[in-house]
Amino acid sequence: MSTLYLERSVADGRRGDWTEELDLSGVDRIVVGTGPGSFAGVRAAIAFAQGYALGRPSCEVFGLPSPCALAGDGRVAVVGDARRGLFWVALFDGFRQNGDVFLSDAESLPSAVPDGFRVVTTDEARIGESLRGVFGPRYTGGGTPTGEGLRRFAEANPAALVREPLPIYLTPAVRPAAD
């Protein structure tokens, strides 16, 4: 089985010429990070994977929450900036996610992360100092979810793979006001 784990970002350019370098022959499984993250980026990744697989009946698309890419080494809480004074939190025991990604306000954050969990963030520049103040030595710094991290998690815990992935939405959609 050939699985595609690929890292791209908006900073890599929108032209798409990077796809010319890809050898996609024989790929029969694509794993994408489902967020939390850039709304457009997560949706674009899922659309790319689904579009590629559309004409290839043997190619399956799976998703994993993006914080899975930072898990695997003991008990870890991955914390991100959800904006508007909120944080998103994902808890892991090795390669097992303990529940869904959830939101916490700043006041509740210390109790949202159980004792014995080290804390990392995907948003070091924005919230690293704040997390260091809240968690002290339990805070071990920032990390970036990578395709390699998703690969490690998927291979260690294939049951965690989600068929027909959707982006993680932390807050409900806001409907336009009626005129």
Where are these regions (language model features)?
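Oxyanion-binding and handling regions
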Residues: 1-16, 24, 61-179
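Helix-loop module immediately N-terminal to the HCX5R catalytic loop
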Residues: 20
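DPxDG-like acidic metal-binding loop motif
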Residues: 29-60
